[in-house]
Regions:
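ATPase/helicase motor core of nucleic-acid motors
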Residues: 282-283, 370-504
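Conserved RecA-like helicase ATPase core segment
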Residues: 242-333, 610-618
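Helicase P-loop NTPase motor core
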Residues: 52-69, 285-287, 293-400, 646-653
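Conserved helicase NTPase motor core
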Residues: 2-60, 113, 146, 184-278, ...
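C-terminal accessory regions
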Residues: 568-651
Length: 654
């Protein structure tokens, strides 16, 4: 049986893939493991300069990355490697693997950079001080999720007659993602003033950061120190990111691109384009490879996910092989659970946590000690706030809170005080000053007047002769004095600060200051942490606790022993794509639970994805809160009938 790589760059033929799938599926456990390892080894040591790997969920791409890097160093001891991904956890895990690799010398390890694309772009733009058209001062800042709308509001203020709905930030952000701008006079003016504001603030948003990095590389190719590249999650790249990568990897000594067009998640979040990887698959300059065996998820989970993604496939989708690494195992079938109400669903979750408390506590300790990196349980939701569960969402939050790792990031109150303190130390920082004007609730018209005056006169905001500016600076200096008061307790400092600015959560603020005091030595590190948090908000990935509540989109790159998907109904999951649900299912290693709760957000039936689940590898149950029991139903039809009966009973009671 041949290995899954086409030297000539041609796509795999459908008929051959089917034959190979049948042959691979006929292998026993040892045969599957042997083939997986040999296939990955052949790909890792392949002579092709450019390789595209189609890699389904949990098929071992991290091992392939490390093996390919080792191969490159065997061929070229002076190689300089860049690995980039959207998923910070994957970057961190790969860095740990590199650090522990005994085949690589310390010098070689030092020549490997594993980074998120945003962090890499930031480095390029910082080194180049922006671009020729739009220069930055050293140490430019990142415009985080919340502040994007504030800065765009500042841009719109220059053109008050424009319709804010028609010229919304989301529409401009999409133009940045696509690296393609509307040609109308109105949009051209807004683009110009936005970039002028960024220069004035010495700050950039994540979307325009990518464009700036590409232009910086065009201006100065020496900024790229790498000659071997691994590009991960290529299916989620947008046009701007693709242009940056193409500029970066121009004539590489080695290039490995990895992705799966059926795992695209960021179409809505940042205009990801699965067509990019599909087009690359047709490009004969790249040898095409495939990883066929899922070693992460259990037999039934892999079979369920594999069956699901085969249903109603897009015509231009890349055909692939996706099989479990074992012919069978002891793990349960996928559990699809019907609940009468949201409190019933939460009771199911609570019972699962109670039943597994010993194992969860053990995982919590190992995560804290760095011996484990994955959660024990992921609770995945279509909507971040879980408002569709009503009051029951508080109980979920309480369950999760018990197993959280120490909060690595700080409260809004903390960052607010940081801004006042920072401005007192560096009043020339216009972006920080803009934050203070927001916190001080200065009228929009007045803020615009101040910004416009400063920009026209080539001044900083702190140089403007204005009562609002003077009062703001006085308040900043007062807070700086309080923060630096020797001998005062944290409680005393907070009490004094509240006489100047409002504080939402004094208890959390006290914890934050106790953990990291605000002072001049710490301020750069804290501001960097704030920007890291902004990047996490951009793509929703964070450090794991033993039990985590995450959005489906936010689960990208993660895995857990057990996964519970909530909101599986006709209302709350109606906007979740097939690809996103596929990704959610394949986060699970040992067990997967899919919960439909009626009356949550108006839900009256299960999600349409129910019909695309296989009968052979999923079991369907009702669950009752009164006695905490599951009762098996007769397949999907029995599941639907049970929900319909619940609806009928509910109507009769009215």
């Amino acid at each position: 049986m041949r290995h899954l790589i086409n030297n000539d760059g041609t796509p795999f033929e459908t008929s051959e893939l089917q034959s190979l799938r049948d042959e691979l599926d006929a292998l026993d456990n040892d045969g599957r493991t042997e083939y997986r390892n040999q296939n990955a080894s052949v790909i890792a040591q392949h002579v092709a300069v450019k390789i595209l790997i189609v890699s389904g969920p949990g098929t071992g791409k991290s091992y392939l990355f490390l093996n390919r890097i080792n191969h490159w160093y065997q061929q070229d001891a002076q190689a300089k490697v860049l690995v980039t991904s959207f998923v910070r956890k994957l970057v961190a895990d790969l860095q740990n693997d590199i650090d522990g690799d005994e085949q690589l010398s310390d010098e070689q390890k030092g020549n490997i950079t594993a980074s998120t694309l945003h962090k890499f772009a930031r480095s390029i733009v910082e080194q180049n001080h922006g671009t020729t058209d739009w220069r930055f001062q050293p140490h430019f800042r990142i415009i985080g999720q919340f502040w994007k709308d504030v800065v765009w509001g500042d841009a719109l203020a220059f053109y008050p007659l424009l319709n804010k709905g028609e010229y919304a930030w989301k529409k401009f952000e999409e133009q940045l993602y696509n690296a393609e701008f509307e040609q109308s006079e109105e949009w051209a003016k807004l683009k110009e003033i936005y970039f002028k504001l960024c220069q004035f603030y010495n700050a950039a948003g994540f979307a325009d950061l990518i464009l700036r990095a590409k232009d910086a590389l065009v201006e100065n190719s020496q900024l790229n120190e790498s000659n071997y590249f691994i590009i991960d999650e290529y299916q989620d790249f947008n046009s701007a990111e693709d242009a940056l990568i193409n500029q970066l990897v121009n004539e590489p000594k080695g290039l490995l691109v990895v992705g799966d067009d059926e795992q695209v998640l960021y179409e809505k979040l940042k205009s990801g384009k699965p067509t990019l990887i599909r087009n690359l698959y047709q490009n004969n300059d790249y040898a095409n490879g495939m990883l066929p065996f899922c070693g992460r998820s259990s037999f039934h989970i892999t079979k369920t996910a594999g069956h699901f993604i085969q249903q109603q496939r897009e015509a231009d989708c890349i055909e692939k092989i996706y099989l479990p690494i074992k012919t069978t195992d002891d793990s349960p079938k996928v559990q699809v659970i019907a609940c009468a109400t949201a409190p019933t669903a939460v009771d199911y979750i609570e019972k699962f946590v109670v039943d597994n408390k010993t194992a969860i506590d053990e995982r919590k300790n190992k995560l804290a000690e760095g011996e484990e990196k994955d959660a024990f349980l992921l609770i995945l939701t279509p909507a971040k706030e879980v408002n569709f569960y009503g009051e029951s969402k508080k109980k979920i939050a309480k369950i999760v809170a018990e197993y959280q790792v120490e909060n690595l990031y700080f409260s809004e109150d903390y960052y607010k005080i940081l801004s006042y303190y920072s401005l007192a130390n560096n009043p020339q920082n216009n972006f920080t000053f803009r934050k203070i004007l927001f916190y001080e609730d200065i009228a929009e018209a007045k803020v615009h007047e101040l910004i416009e005056g400063a920009m026209q006169n080539g001044q900083n905001l702190c140089d403007i002769d204005s009562e609002e500016i003077k009062i703001s600076l006085q308040k900043c200096n007062a807070i700086k004095t309080i923060v630096e008061t020797v001998g005062a307790t944290i409680e005393e400092k907070i009490k004094s600060i509240t006489s100047h600015i409002s504080i939402v959560d004094k208890v959390r603020l006290k914890e934050d200051i106790a953990r990291k005091s605000i002072n001049q030595e710490e301020i750069i590190e804290i501001e960097h942490k704030e920007e890291e948090e902004a990047e996490l908000e951009e793509i929703e990935v964070k450090k794991m606790g033993a039990v985590e509540l995450l959005t489906i989109v936010g689960s990208k790159g993660l895995s857990a022993d057990h996964v519970i998907i909530i909101g599986f109904d006709n209302v709350n999951m109606s906007w979740i794509t097939k690809n996103a649900f596929y990704v959610a299912m394949t986060r699970a290693r040992k067990s997967l639970h899919i919960l439909t709760a009626l009356k949550s957000g108006g839900a009256r039936q299960s999600n349409g994805f129910l019909d695309q689940l296989p009968d052979d590898h999923a079991e369907f149950y009702s669950y009752k809160k009164t006695d905490h029991t599951k009762n098996q139903l007769q397949g999907k039809q029995g599941f639907k009938t049970y929900l319909n009966n619940l609806n009928s009973m509910s109507q009769q009671r009215r």
